[in-house]
């Protein structure tokens, strides 16, 4: 298992709230919690920035992390990430914050310690461009949105 440096910024982690962990051996994401001081109501259409109480330093340029929404929050409550996805570069060392957007028509209350997002580590390839006049032909070619059909 890859070792990643994690800094605890909120002293409630490890006492009141657990360190981020994988729920099962097959889990891809670690749950991130709302480390707020008191419950926070997110009004319909509002976006808020919520601290997670941690920072990570990935260090390995072949890795990055992404902050992704939790499916239940979006499907059941209309709570999604304000920036749709958060990208954490390997050299970033600051606090992990979660932008929550209430896309529903009802207020939603985030409780202290609620699991609000998940953190997934992903491989990174930095590309070097090769300038060409033409691409090698493929069956798809320039076919874009909807090109491959519905069924």
Swiss-Prot record:
Q: Which UniProt keywords apply?
A: Hydrolase, Magnesium, Metal-binding, Nucleotide metabolism
| Essential cofactor(s) | Mg(2+)
Q: What class of enzyme is it?
A: hydrolase
Q: Which cysteines are joined by disulfide bonds?
A: none
Q: In which pathway does it act?
A: Pyrimidine metabolism; dUMP biosynthesis; dUMP from dCTP (dUTP route): step 2/2
Query: What EC designation does it have?
Result: 3.6.1.23
Matching entries from Pfam families are given as: dUTPase
Q: What does this protein do?
A: This enzyme is involved in nucleotide metabolism: it produces dUMP, the immediate precursor of thymidine nucleotides and it decreases the intracellular concentration of dUTP so that uracil cannot be incorporated into DNA.
Protein name as it appears in the record: Deoxyuridine 5'-triphosphate nucleotidohydrolase
Organism of provenance? Glaesserella parasuis serovar 5 (strain SH0165)
Lineage of the organism: Bacteria, Pseudomonadati, Pseudomonadota, Gammaproteobacteria, Pasteurellales
What's the encoding gene here? dut
């Amino acid at each position: 298992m890859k070792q990643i440096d994690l800094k605890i910024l909120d002293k409630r982690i490890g006492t009141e709230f657990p360190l981020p962990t994988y729920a099962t051996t097959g889990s891809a994401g670690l749950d991130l919690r709302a480390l707020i001081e008191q419950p926070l109501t997110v009004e319909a259409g509002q976006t808020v920035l919520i601290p997670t109480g941690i920072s990570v330093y990935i260090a390995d340029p072949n890795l990055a992390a992404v902050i992704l929404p939790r499916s239940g929050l979006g499907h059941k409550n209309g709570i999604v990430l304000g920036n749709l996805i958060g990208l954490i570069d390997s050299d970033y060392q600051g606090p992990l914050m979660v932008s929550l957007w209430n896309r529903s028509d009802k207020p939603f209350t985030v409780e202290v310690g609620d699991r609000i997002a998940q953190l997934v580590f992903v491989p990174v390839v930095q590309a070097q461009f090769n300038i060409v006049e033409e691409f090698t032909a493929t069956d798809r070619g320039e076919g874009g949105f909807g090109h491959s059909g519905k069924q």
